[in-house]
Each structure stands twice: as C-alpha cells, then as structure tokens.
Regions:
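Short, compositionally biased leader-like segments
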Residues: 1-18
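Generic alpha-helical secondary structure signal
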Residues: 4-8, 59-63, 84-87, 191-194, ...
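Glycine-rich loop-to-alpha-helix module at the N-terminal edge of alpha/beta enzyme cores
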Residues: 12-14, 22, 41-133
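Short loop/turn motifs at secondary-structure junctions and domain boundaries
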Residues: 20-29
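Short, acidic, Ser/Thr-enriched surface-loop or helix-capping motifs
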Residues: 35-37
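PLP-dependent aspartate aminotransferase-fold enzymes
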Residues: 91-207
Length: 207
C-alpha cells in the first residue's frame, strides 16, 4: 500500500486522530522511531504507551524471535491452562522483578485493567482492616491527582482527569477526592524546587 494512503485507509474504519508519523517497524531501532515516509528518526519518549520498554528490534528479541512467534501464534487462557512458555515467563519475572515479600503475582494485560486490579486489592485490604479495627465498612475512596490519566475503563474513569471532558461526560463516575499535583515547571529555579520539597513534607532549615 502506498505510504500516502495509509492514514486515509485506516481512517475508513477507525478514528485517526493520532500522530502524523507512519512507523517503519523494520527500520526503527532502540529508542528511535523511523518514519516510513521520509526515513526521519524520532526519539520515542513514550515507548508506545510503555508497551515497548526495550525499544524497537532489540538484539535479544531478534535473536530469539522464534520463541516470540510461537507465543504470538496462540493465546491460551493462562489462568486456566498452563504451558512451558508460561513457566519460563513467570520464573524469569519472579527472579528479576518480584520482591521476596510479595510471593505471588497477578498478571493483567493492559494498563487500565492493571490499575483496576490494584484498586480492588486496595479496597479489599482497607475495608477488611477498618472492619477489624471496629471502624466499619469504610475504605472505598481513592485520593488522586488532578490532570492525571489512568485509563477509561470502569474504576479508572473516576481517576482520569481528562483534558477533553466530552470523552467521559456521560459516564457514571465515583465522587472521589482529587488533589493538586506537586508538579514542577520549567525552567527550574529555586522557588519551583522549593515548592516540590514543601509538597513532600520536607522542611529545609534556613541558613
């Protein structure tokens, strides 16, 4: 297909309000995205919404692509039936990323659903703790920052402070407390850094 027609062709079937670049998946490398139209390289600072943390065409991935192809051909229900590939995966994740004080992992496919499952765990833990302390069935509110994005699935819509309210205006949401984010603005100066320090509760003695 002609590169000039790709965006129009996709636009026949879905909303195309994304970036203008047409990614060349074969030539992109490391943290650099290559535009298929002109070969220009862009430093990918969002790594495809954090779905490509090792970058494009990582040497290890290319060397072991047969393993990845085999896994991509089939999508088993990993919560119900197991495979050698799954055993390798959970063993590696357990060794590399799982701390000893958290013996069990719960894998979720996608950021919004990962946030939702973290919320469920927090609700369950907090309410049980309050019940045990005689405080009643409390602990079902989530404090969160303004101008944040955690997804647009069920619970996460109540956390996402969308820059375009039309996207969620008719969806029911929980009235959870939303607070200012202690962000910094460039250029950095003594005052902006002091604001961050103060918001974290750190008190720096005057000279």
């Amino acid at each position: 297909m002609s590169l000039d027609n790709i965006r129009d062709q996709i636009g026949k079937y879905i909303l195309t309000d994304g970036m203008s670049q047409i990614v060349d998946l074969g030539k992109s490398h490391g943290a650099w995205l290559v535009d298929a139209r002109d070969g220009k390289e862009y430093l990918d600072l969002f790594s495809m919404t954090a779905s490509m943390p090792v970058g494009y065409n990582h040497p290890y991935v290319l060397k072991n692509q047969d393993r990845f192809i085999s896994s991509a051909l089939n999508k088993p229900a990993n919560s119900d039936i197991y495979s050698n590939e799954m055993a390798d995966f959970v063993t590696t994740m357990g060794r590399v990323a799982q701390p000893n004080y958290l013996p069990y992992a719960f894998y979720v496919e996608g950021g919004a659903l990962a946030v939702e499952n973290a919320l469920k765990a927090a609700f369950d833990w907090k309410v049980r703790k309050n019940l045990a302390d005689g405080k009643g069935e409390k602990g079902s509110k989530i404090i969160h920052f303004k101008e944040c994005f955690h997804g647009r699935s069920g619970y996460t819509m109540s956390l996402t402070d969308s820059s375009d309210p039309r996207k969620t205006m008719y969806y029911p949401q929980f009235d959870w407390p939303r607070i200012d984010s202690p962000k910094i603005h460039y250029p950095l100066d003594d005052q902006s850094l002091q604001n961050v320090i103060n918001s974290s509760g750190v008190k720096v003695p005057s000279e």
